[in-house]
Amino acid sequence: MARSINLAVIPGDGIGQEVVAQGLKVLSAALPSDVKLETKEFDFGARRYHATGETLTDADLDALKQHDAILLGAIGDPSVPSGVLERGFLLKLRFAFDHHVNLRPSKLLPGVETPLAGQPEIDFVVVREGTEGPYTGNGGTIRTGTPHAVATEVSLNTAFGIERVVRDAYARAQARPRKKLALVHKNNVLVHAGHLWTDIFNKVGEEFPDVTTEYMHVDAATIYLVTQPERFDVIVTDNLFGDIITDLAAAISGGIGVAASGNINPSGAYPSMFEPVHGSAPDIAGQGKADPSATILSVALLLRHLGYEAEAARIEEAVSADLAERVGKPARSTDEIGDALTVRVAG
């Protein structure tokens, strides 16, 4: 394990500045005294776009590549046309750094309300393929603006891309107590891509005899996520289905305000990026109202990815305890929550 962490910090837009500041405080408190934390802040997002017209240049990628990991606050602002920052920054970074595993833990934490009846046991992880499917930009339009307009959006699925994300999901399932893995797709209709996913899922599964597996159509999965969320342990799925069901998973486990995520390059060839699922929330930016818990839980994912398991667990335990103690109490500011969690983590 490296005894230093060289971290790229991207506060981004809106509340990103506020929540990332709290995440860094907790990160510093969690690290052992002999681990040196070095950070470099990058000004990406709406402000830079308006000033320069740039989102993410090749020189930016070269600079980011020198770091061990990336912590992102939020990217997005209503002053920028829709899709400009998403494609020009987020997707460009994902493809450039081969972040082919999008990791989304979904756990109902103490003191957090779920819209589901009762208080079901919710503790699973979605492993979403991040660099293929219909998000590769493979498509086009003709006869645009006419009654005969045609648009195509091609879903790209390769055996190489599928196998590596499926293998990652099996390894994560193997490491969890329940050792269960579900493949979610729609292979009865999307027969070409669906059968490729299914065949590779079954073949890789032969190497993981301790992992119990099942296949589930995506429409059935959305039902079971609501009616039987406790049946899930690890889910692996493609880019599009993963984009949809991870938001449903966040909704049933307390909302995106406490949802963390990681965009992972498991090989370590490029730094992985960790971020809260919530957006930039420009309507409350600068008011101290943003809850930094999702960012702080993303810091825990970052530490676990870098090999600091005990420190990651300590952060998660601190957030759980803090959430449990909030019930029935007045809302606190962003700084107050961050300060309280920093004290808990520091011990």
From Swiss-Prot:
GO terms for molecular function: 3-isopropylmalate dehydrogenase activity; magnesium ion binding; NAD binding. Its cofactor is Mg(2+); Mn(2+). Substrate binds at R94, R104, R128, D219. Keywords: Amino-acid biosynthesis, Branched-chain amino acid biosynthesis, Cytoplasm, Leucine biosynthesis, Magnesium, Manganese, Metal-binding, NAD, Oxidoreductase. InterPro entries: ICDH/IPMDH, IsoCit/isopropylmalate_DH_CS, IsoPropMal-DH-like_dom, LeuB_actb. PANTHER family: D-MALATE DEHYDROGENASE [DECARBOXYLATING] (PTHR43275:SF1). NAD(+) binds at G279, S280, A281, P282, D283, I284, A285, G286, Q287, G288, K289, A290, D291. Homodimer. Catalyzes the oxidation of 3-carboxy-2-hydroxy-4-methylpentanoate (3-isopropylmalate) to 3-carboxy-4-methyl-2-oxopentanoate. The product decarboxylates to 4-methyl-2 oxopentanoate. The keyword Magnesium applies. It catalyses: (2R,3S)-3-isopropylmalate + NAD(+) = 4-methyl-2-oxopentanoate + CO2 + NADH. Belongs to the isocitrate and isopropylmalate dehydrogenases family. LeuB type 2 subfamily. GO terms for cellular component: cytoplasm. Pathway: Amino-acid biosynthesis; L-leucine biosynthesis; L-leucine from 3-methyl-2-oxobutanoate: step 3/4. Mg(2+) binds at D219, D243, D247. This is 3-isopropylmalate dehydrogenase. PROSITE patterns: IDH_IMDH. It is an enzyme of class 1 (oxidoreductase). Its EC number is 1.1.1.85. It is found in: Cytoplasm. Binds 1 Mg(2+) or Mn(2+) ion per subunit. The record marks Y135, K186 as: Important for catalysis. Its main location: cytoplasm. The keyword S-adenosyl-L-methionine does not apply. One of its GO terms (biological process) is L-leucine biosynthetic process.
